[in-house]
């Protein structure tokens, strides 16, 4: 199995269940984030895109992209564990970088958990660096507060 066997394409509604399952297998789901809401928001927002990697009809990877005009963001970068180290993640990130560049956004950033050392290493191998920005948060609804 390698990246040549996979095709990157736009997310389609028929992918929804398989995509959520992929995110689950990859450990990306959190109780306070409804993945269906995240998908809906992405596909209905003009400054975002959801791309998937498909091999013979099987969803094996994803990347959710967005930008605010100053920086592009990568969320839900996922590669099924059976496909790790086959170039799928690199292909998704190359796509993400081109997408951000085509939108004339000067910088791309990725979101990941600080303790996810394998993923942090992956990004470093692609030339990404830790930055000195500290993210703060505040939950604005009870559902999120009670689930965190």
Locate the predicted segments by residue:
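Conserved acetyl-CoA-binding loop-helix of GNAT-fold acetyltransferases
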Residues: 85-98, 125
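Acetyl-CoA-dependent GNAT
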Residues: 6, 10-76, 80, 95, ...
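Residue-level recognition of specific faces of alpha-helices
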Residues: 73-76, 111, 122
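Conserved beta-strand-loop-alpha-helix junction that forms the acyl-donor binding cleft
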Residues: 110-119, 137-141
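Generic C-terminal helix-cap and adjacent flexible tail
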Residues: 2-3, 140-148
